[in-house]
């Protein structure tokens, strides 16, 4: 990422003598808000009125922002310090460095600084506008991060299927029927270099419909990450009838699988259930690699919960360089909260107890049983359709 020509990114490092004790990733980018009401619920008519004003007639709000953390990822990855450096000392060091940071590409420092993300306890109250990180900053919370737990004793994908409730397992099988004609082909570095522009165009098909954007993926990013991470960064091309209709990519890290980016042609989504199948492939990769978790990110909460993802609250710390704007933004944050969602519960209760050690904490998020909606037109064709299980062709990756 540091070498990407399209990105304005830098690494911060802290030393004690000759010893490296801390690192952080900082990137200057542009945030773009569209249809904010899809993710944030206003608790005041005044907040709704202000939101309409700042978004203008076009309903779009753009502003430069300096981000401490990965602009394209979700999770606690803003900075890292050695264990003997206390959390308070680490936060103070990052705060001081960001405040004194250099000017951006325009010759000026962005007026907004964002540090992301921080885990929140499920039972924590509203954090919008409060000092969740340090004084002089205020918290902001959007949708939770959705993660799928993987049992330590699971030896194959069938163990995942067996851990689901009947209706959820039926849905996974229905996804398999819908996408039965798809090939999932893992790309080598040379193939990623050759296909980078085409893959990026598929990504833009999805990115263009996002309600909130923080930076974006560049075609060059795929090549650089594949070159740097090798087999731990997988890029999967999805073909249907010989045509490339989508792709997915992700990381294998110490803490689990990180679903990174996907792209697909919208016209194929409903017929082939491409997005749902991508989620299943990430979960398969997690099971087969022995990872404890599969991080599926923040979007499409309902769909992800239907295949076993659980919500984990995350907050960001925000600071405006302009004191007046900072006060107004903090006040607005206090009048908003993440929009409540009704999530499905896909797991058998005894499985959750054995995998997590306790019942999952939903932090006020309502749950409901998994119900099948809009069945795939292929699902009821043939007497043996209900017996189809997820599988890949001989040329496909096992992820």
Language model feature labels by segment:
Residues 31-138, 256-316:
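Acyl-donor binding region in acyl/amide transferases
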Residues 1-43, 114-270:
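A conserved beta-strand-loop-helix scaffold within acyl/acetyltransferase catalytic domains
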Residues 29, 76, 132-164, 240, ...:
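Active-site/acyl-donor-binding loops of N-acyltransferases
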Residues 38-70, 321-355, 371:
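Alpha-helical membrane-targeting segments
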Residues 390-398:
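Short, intrinsically disordered C-terminal tails of secreted or membrane-associated proteins
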């Amino acid at each position: 990422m540091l070498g990407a020509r399209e990105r304005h990114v830098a690494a911060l490092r802290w030393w004690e003598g000759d010893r490296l004790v801390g690192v952080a990733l900082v990137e200057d980018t542009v945030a773009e808000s569209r249809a904010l009401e899809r993710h944030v619920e206003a608790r005041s008519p005044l907040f709704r009125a202000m939101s309409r004003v700042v978004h203008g007639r076009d309903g779009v709000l753009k502003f430069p922002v300096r981000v401490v953390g990965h602009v394209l990822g979700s999770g606690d990855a803003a900075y890292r310090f050695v264990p003997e450096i206390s959390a308070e000392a680490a936060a103070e060091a990052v705060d001081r460095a960001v405040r004194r940071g250099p000017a951006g590409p325009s010759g000026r420092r962005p007026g907004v600084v964002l540090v992301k993300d921080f885990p929140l306890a499920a039972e924590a109250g509203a954090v919008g506008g409060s000092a969740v990180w340090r004084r002089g900053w205020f918290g902001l919370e959007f949708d939770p991060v959705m993660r799928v737990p993987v049992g330590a004793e699971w030896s194959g994908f069938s163990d995942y299927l067996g851990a689901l409730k009947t209706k959820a397992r039926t849905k996974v099988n229905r996804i398999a029927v819908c996408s039965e004609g798809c090939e999932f082909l893992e790309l080598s570095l040379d193939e990623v270099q050759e296909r980078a522009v085409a893959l990026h165009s598929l990504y833009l098909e999805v990115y263009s419909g996002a309600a909130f954007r923080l930076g974006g993926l560049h075609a060059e990013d795929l090549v650089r990450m594949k070159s740097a991470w090798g087999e731990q960064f997988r890029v999967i091309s999805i073909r249907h009838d010989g045509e490339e209709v989508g792709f997915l990519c992700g990381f294998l890290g110490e803490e689990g699988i990180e679903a990174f980016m996907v792209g697909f042609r919208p016209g194929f989504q409903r017929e082939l259930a491409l997005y749902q199948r991508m989620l299943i492939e990430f979960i398969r990769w997690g099971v087969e690699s022995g990872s404890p978790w599969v991080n599926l990110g923040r979007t499409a909460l309902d769909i992800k919960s239907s295949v076993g993802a659980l919500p984990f609250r995350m907050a960001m710390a925000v600071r405006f360089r302009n004191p007046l704007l900072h006060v107004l933004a903090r006040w607005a944050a206090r009048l908003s909260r993440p929009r409540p969602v009704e999530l499905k519960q896909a797991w058998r209760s005894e499985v959750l107890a054995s995998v997590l050690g306790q019942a999952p904490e939903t932090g006020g998020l309502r749950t409901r049983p998994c119900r099948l909606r809009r069945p795939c037109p292929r699902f009821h064709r043939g007497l043996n359709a209900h017996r189809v299980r997820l599988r890949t062709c001989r040329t496909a990756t096992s992820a």
